[in-house]
Amino acid sequence: LATTKPTPLFPTYAELTELSLSDYPQLSAYLENQPKWMQQHWHWAKDYLLYIGRNKSEHTYVRFRNDIEKFLLWVFMVDKQPVDDLRKADILRYIDFCVAPPVRWISTQLHDRFNLSNGYFASNLNWTPFRQTPPKYDKDRVLDPKKYKPSLQTLESTFVALSSFYRHLIDEEICFGNPIPLAKRDCKHMIKDSQVKTISRLTEHQWQYLLDTAVELADTDALFERNLFIISTMKTLFLRLSELSERLDWSPVMSHFWTDEDNNWWFKVYGKGKKIRDITVPQSYLSYLKRYREWRGLSSLPSKGEQTVLVEKIRGRGGLTSRQISRLVQQVFDAAFDKMKSEKGLEAAQKLNEATTHYLRHTGASMEIERDRPLKDLSEDLGHSSSATTDTVYVQVERKRRASSGKDRKVE
């Protein structure tokens, strides 16, 4: 029944690669109590997620795991039809379910799926498939699961994951068709978005304020040297959060900073789509790199082959995860917001309250556009597939032309 509390089905990718159901007593008992076809479905989904984990990024695995898990729980507990029997109308009913899931399926906090207890992975009773989060600019908002409503982007992501799952089942000759594209075409919840896109960025003044705050924090407390290094690096080198973080198949190290025969500095990055690229490093950035390395007791600049972790944990070994880096960035955003609010008022500071880590990449790229850097060079630093992508996201020539042509029309 939809009112029954659902149980988690899949752990992290690292745990899934070594999964033995004997180590997951509640999950094992749950599956054993299901019909054979449901147990088979779980194994289909497990094989698919292992494929995603091997061939895609950790972020993609997490995103697809979340969507496939929700879908299977709906199949097991609500619809009770095998996935290879589902048609367009069934998928549309599932999307209706995702738009208004039962309250028992929604939580307002992030919970781990499984907790290690006495050598076993116990299913977390607090975990739910859906999570309601407050907007970043209103973190104190009291949430009501009855008012849960997924964003258009969330629904889009659901369709992408389900379509990928069905394509995998077709490749494995389990299914003979993919009902997802037809369902998406006819879904009443999918609204075509042709709105004018704005860039989520800081102004030059806001960026300088954020950087000055990070410097002040680091001058006062040396532990904030990491925060300063992270925000200056993400903005100046246009990095995505994942590109600075420790991943299963990549660990950023100091020797990823390197020089060519002309003494130009570069930074090697493992980016989106499992592509490695080199980013130009400006001279102005080197003082921040030197400051950070000096704090860590290293030589002023990296040497060839240096395997020192780029952003290391204070306790423990290895580099920081995306979530840990995000927390360090957020500390600086919060401090800058509080400072600007007290000095210039809430309205002036609001953008710093709304900003996320990705604002740093967008801010750096937008400021490069403003200084007339060649689009092709910037596009390669950003890791875009073409200059057209960079133009669409940052330059927005068509939007500016349209705004200009419509600006002088008359009312009378």
Task: For every predicted segment, state its role.
Residues A45-H59, E69-K197, L217:
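N-terminal core-binding DNA-recognition domain of tyrosine recombinases/integrases
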Residues L152, Y209-L241:
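Basic, Lys/Arg- and aromatic-enriched nucleic-acid-binding interface segment
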Residues S163-R167, N227-E246, W266-F267, M367:
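Short pre-functional
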Residues D171-I174, M234-N263, D377:
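Short, charged phosphate-coordinating catalytic segments
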Residues E246-R291, G297:
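Conserved tyrosine-mediated DNA breakage-rejoining catalytic core shared by Y-recombinases
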Residues G271-R291, E306-V332, E354:
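C-terminal catalytic core of Y-nucleophile DNA break-rejoin enzymes
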Residues S326-E380, S387:
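Short, basic (Lys/Arg/His-rich) helix/loop patches that form interaction surfaces
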Residues T392-E412:
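DNA/chromatin major-groove-contacting recognition/catalytic segments
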